Curated annotation (Swiss-Prot):
It comes from the Bacteria. One of its GO terms (biological process) is nucleobase-containing small molecule interconversion. The lineage of its organism: Bacteria, Bacillati, Bacillota, Clostridia, Eubacteriales. InterPro entries: Cytidylate_kin (IPR003136), Cytidylate_kinase_dom (IPR011994), P-loop_NTPase (IPR027417). Its EC number is 2.7.4.25. Belongs to the cytidylate kinase family. Type 1 subfamily. HAMAP family: Cytidyl_kinase_type1 (MF_00238). This is Cytidylate kinase.
Length: 222
């Protein structure tokens, strides 16, 4: 596996992983892979097909027959079975249910294998919750981004408003705290920093400051 070309960026919901990872990828001329979008796509399909989200077997089979394509561009597009669902995977319904789907071991096995295959094909910047610990454990550059729940809720609110959704900030804070608990306490691939990850608390930092910090660390590690 060409993990020496890969940068792993992990962290909780709303930590700014995707925005930061995109910019890092652009500056270093690497492919950006949003693994969270893949779990969101499976969740969206399950909701559309009215599959019981507590039926692990049904969801594993769903993941196996789901084709997810990530298209590079200024704003990465996500295709679900050939159809653009970039906006649909960011709905509150998907956001509130994706942790249920993501904690299923069989679903993770299917998607992790696909993520590793992507990393085999090209140097990548990959963000998620278990990239440095599970997906690309031998990646030379690993980062763990975090920020306060309030800061992350404000960022998520801005993202949702950009997609045209109404936002209740207090409710968002509550949902983020609940998701943190679920992600950190799940039996499979819990949200924890890799032992060799660089920890970055982005509270009060601009996106560009975080990006430059990561690039500085990457350049040092060459």
């Amino acid at each position: 596996m060409t993990e020496h070309k890969c940068i792993a960026i992990d962290g909780p919901a709303g930590a700014g992983k995707s925005t930061v990872a995109k910019k890092v990828a652009q500056k270093l001329n690497l492919l950006y892979i949003d693994t969270g979008a893949m779990y969101r796509a499976v969740t969206l399909k399950a909701l559309r097909e009215r599959i019981n989200l507590w039926d692990d077997i049904a969801l594993i089979e769903l993941a196996k027959r789901t084709i997810i394509t990530l298209l590079a561009g200024q704003k990465q597009s996500v295709l679900l079975d050939g159809l653009d669902v970039t906006r649909e995977i960011r709905t509150p319904e998907v956001t509130n249910n994706v942790s249920i789907v993501a904690k299923i071991a069989g679903v993770r096995e299917v998607l992790v294998q696909r993520q590793r295959e992507m990393a085999e094909e090209a140097g990548v910047v990959m963000d998620g919750r278990d990239i440095g610990t599970v997906v690309l454990p031998k990646a030379k550059a690993k980062f763990f981004l975090t920020a306060s729940a309030e800061e992350r809720a404000r960022r998520r609110a801005k993202e949702m408003m950009n997609f045209g959704y109404d936002v209740d900030l207090e409710q968002l804070i509550k949902e983020i705290e609940e998701r943190d608990f679920m992600d950190s306490n799940r039996a499979v691939s819990p949200l924890v920093p890799a032992e060799d990850a660089v920890l970055i608390d982005s509270s009060g930092m601009t996106i560009d400051e975080v990006v430059n910090s990561i690039i500085t660390w990457v350049e040092k590690g060459k």
